[in-house]
Amino acid sequence: MINNFFVINMKETLKNLTKAYIGESLARNRYTCYAKIAKQEGYEQIAEIFLLTAENEREHAKWLYYLITELKKKYNIDDKAIKVDGVEVPIVLGNTAENLKASIEGEHFEHTEMYPKFADIAEKEGLKEIADRLRAIGIAEKHHEERFKKLLKEVEEGTVFKKDKPVEWVCRKCGFVHLGKEPPEKCPSCSHPRKYFEVKCEKY
């Protein structure tokens, strides 16, 4: 049972961390679902990027959960649950283009509104380390949005497997490299279909 005294008087940051934790946890599961759809539609690389982003969100959620438990200790809150209002749950599940659009919208909201607002509140409450952590997570979400935008552009323009000029395509299964505007229908090295090719991009 939640103690009403603490619900009314707990720091706003504790509520915000809980909202963010819920959001990151849900995003992780959505991206996992989106990865399966991308794979079914022949977008192997996009599927992997969804899974990579899901893992990023898992890491965010882990840190948020840690910060929540630390604040509970600080304020001597023994309750086993925190009640928060105003949590919206995205339920978009469409094709890859639709899923990318929904992902872009979510990531944009997080890095332009949610995390900056939550960080400012935390700083006002004297929780600078938490504020810094929230701003850092926001930077990661900005990167997610930028990456999803690039992928959406390619899906909508039909250029995932077709470029204007010859580029190097690398097979994601065996590493074979092909030079051309499009990848081969089948990898001559391992026989995997063209959906396993991606543009070679290596900067070390």
From Swiss-Prot:
Positions contributing to Fe(3+) 2 binding: 57, 107, 141, 144
Binding of Fe(3+) 1, residues: 24, 57, 110, 141
Rubredoxin-like domain span: 166-204
Pfam family, one: Rubrerythrin
Keyword Iron attributed: yes
Cofactor binding comment, as recorded: Binds 3 Fe(3+) ions per subunit.
UniProt keywords, alphabetically: Cytoplasm, Electron transport, Iron, Metal-binding, Transport
Positions contributing to Fe(3+) 3 binding: 171, 174, 187, 190
Main localization of the protein described in the UniProt heading: cytoplasm
Cofactor(s) required, per the database record: Fe(3+)
GO molecular function: iron ion binding; oxidoreductase activity
Keyword Metal-binding: yes
One cellular-component annotation, GO: cytoplasm
Subunit structure: Homodimer. Possesses two rubredoxin-like centers and two non-sulfur oxo-bridged di-iron centers per dimer.
Protein name: Putative rubrerythrin
Organism: Methanocaldococcus jannaschii (strain ATCC 43067 / DSM 2661 / JAL-1 / JCM 10045 / NBRC 100440) (Methanococcus jannaschii)
